[in-house]
From Swiss-Prot:
<dbReference type="InterPro" id="IPR002701">
    <property type="entry name" value="CM_II_prokaryot"/>
</dbReference>
<dbReference type="GO" id="GO:0009697">
    <property type="term" value="P:salicylic acid biosynthetic process"/>
</dbReference>
<dbReference type="InterPro" id="IPR036979">
    <property type="entry name" value="CM_dom_sf"/>
</dbReference>
<feature type="domain" description="Chorismate mutase">
    <location>
        <begin position="23"/>
        <end position="105"/>
    </location>
</feature>
<feature type="binding site">
    <location>
        <position position="61"/>
    </location>
    <ligand>
        <name>chorismate</name>
    </ligand>
</feature>
<dbReference type="InterPro" id="IPR051331">
    <property type="entry name" value="Chorismate_mutase-related"/>
</dbReference>
<feature type="site" description="Important for activation via AroG">
    <location>
        <position position="102"/>
    </location>
</feature>
<dbReference type="GO" id="GO:0004106">
    <property type="term" value="F:chorismate mutase activity"/>
</dbReference>
<feature type="binding site">
    <location>
        <position position="70"/>
    </location>
    <ligand>
        <name>chorismate</name>
    </ligand>
</feature>
<comment type="function">
    <text>Catalyzes the Claisen rearrangement of chorismate to prephenate. Probably involved in the aromatic amino acid biosynthesis.</text>
</comment>
<dbReference type="GO" id="GO:0046417">
    <property type="term" value="P:chorismate metabolic process"/>
</dbReference>
<feature type="site" description="Important for activation via AroG">
    <location>
        <position position="101"/>
    </location>
</feature>
<feature type="site" description="Important for activation via AroG">
    <location>
        <position position="103"/>
    </location>
</feature>
<protein>
    <recommendedName>
        <fullName>Intracellular chorismate mutase</fullName>
        <ecNumber>5.4.99.5</ecNumber>
    </recommendedName>
</protein>
<dbReference type="Pfam" id="PF01817">
    <property type="entry name" value="CM_2"/>
</dbReference>
<keyword id="KW-0028">Amino-acid biosynthesis</keyword>
<dbReference type="GO" id="GO:0009095">
    <property type="term" value="P:aromatic amino acid family biosynthetic process, prephenate pathway"/>
</dbReference>
Length: 105
């Protein structure tokens, strides 16, 4: 029977094994991460475009004597994003804020 190394050596070996595992790329994970990166780039571009369009709508509405925002419209946006759960509502509020700025500021 082989004697076990002291506890601190076990911890060092475990840490070395973990480092080796983490440094070895897993092709499927790398591919999925690349897809996430592409999706993030698309999402960012769409969010920026959404904010631009929203600001243009606000300017046009104000120029024609309307209000800065339409509450019922914003509620429809929040309702749409609520499909994603509670975080969806938060996401909708952030998107609305990006398009018009914070209310009262």
């Amino acid at each position: 029977m082989r004697p076990e190394p002291p506890h601190h050596e076990n911890a060092e070996l475990a840490a070395m094994n973990l480092e080796m595992l983490e440094s070895q790329p897993v092709p499927e994970i790398d591919t999925l991460r690349e897809e996430i990166d592409r999706l993030d780039a698309e999402i960012l571009a769409l969010v920026k475009r959404r904010a631009e369009v929203s600001k243009a709508i606000g300017k046009a509405r104000m120029a024609s004597g309307g209000t800065r925002l339409v509450h019922s419209r914003e509620m429809k946006v929040i309702e749409r994003y609520s499909e994603l759960g509670p975080d969806g509502k938060d996401l909708a509020i952030l998107l609305l804020r990006l398009g018009r700025g914070r209310l009262g500021h």
